[in-house]
């Protein structure tokens, strides 16, 4: 239950064995390859070493194409996803089968061609519909659209704004070109669609006269035939385009049997990408390849066994303290504390060489969650949901941590529900009373702690728990400072407050007073005065003392007061649950009927679903705040870099690895 010890790895291997070695390191999954900056920083090394080039761009393109193809299958051949389904297991040989991978890329290429055809058909349809809509205002015109002129006349189609009076426009036209005629074909809210016939020699005067009213010529591209004929042709073409598009979509859907293979290949491409990126962190010459990285110390024997198969030289060493900021961090915990990795990862990993907070945080986090939720019914729901998810889905990593944490918090919620007598609020007494009975139901009617009546006791208990957790954090910090040789800081920074708190307790209990003077408390105050000003000079000692007293007292008061949220959320959840139970039972106040029972069930289910959802999230957020701000603030040193080894990390399948 600690931060895993890391070893610094330096390795050289003959070039011809590079790919095979990277494959074995990936299967081993315990080596993180570092950036080559340190190797290339030395001028002599940089002169003979060159950075390796992986096919990152190519593999990333393959991953993008596979992902897009899977999305197309989900679009054109959707399937109902099973909520509680586990990931299929594949053998290492099947997962790393290059032949099958290339076959699926060929299938992806065919899907891409079909999708390109679908997009092309969509464009053709959009263009045809646009042309068809442009022709609709002219569909009552019997003249061919390409009839632009006769021997002596010019025929033009155009538009005038709807606000223009056509009679006035025709009069203006007659004044400018007496032999011209203007005919209205159709009108809508925006424009008049008109036909202009004029002598060729009067065309300029006619157009000029109409443009004063906003006239514009229609651009119908000289389509042959009438507008109605062109519309009918467009409709036929659209029908043909739709048919071809639907056929292309059907052809895409026919690749549905490849869905699982695509998922496997997406995982394969993701792993290939990680390997290619790792390869680009290598440097070498024409004959050898060099790398630097980090190894989890417990896996040293496994790595040694793997490297023994290769023509290579390697060196393992412990990192120096100066290198600690660069050392990646991996947390190793037992089954009880492992789920808290999710919480730690959400905040920030601890710095290498410090303390893993999970074993310290786990009992407090789980207990506090149970205090805030405190309902047997809700706890049962959480435990059942977690067990079903773990059994059916067999989740990995983050999802597994979440389910395990949900189960642990469910147990805590159930146990604290026994203390408060909550089972979906006061559901059982409410139902019993609804049927006209008034009986004692043990803890359900006479709980050890009633959130509505024992609020003060619960508040005091919450603050006591807060004091215990904060004191735990200070003890941890004292131990860390002592290990670093900062014994004085441990005594005067943290030890002082323990003496003060002990003195306050003894003073209240009237123990250890000499002549009415609280000796232990006075010693604590003197330690605070000396400790806060021991590094200051002159008048700075005075301000340092006042600052230490003010910041210390207000800081402790504020931190402990934050734990009052334990009582507040317990009270809120209990009250809301009881309110919904009361509302659900009201229709049955005059007697239970079928209708009143249906109303009860509906209100009960909806109300508790809402209350459960709000509390499930709210309790997690507030619990997280107590850990990350109050508790971690007493000892935690963050800033750790996550350990990212070269490994098989998949999303859709689980790979059976029997080699290591």
Where are these predicted regions, by residue range?
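Long, charged N-terminal accessory/stalk domains
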Residues: 1-361, 389, 396-399, 403
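Conserved, carboxylate-rich catalytic/transport cores that coordinate ions
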Residues: 2-7, 16-22, 26-33, 300-660
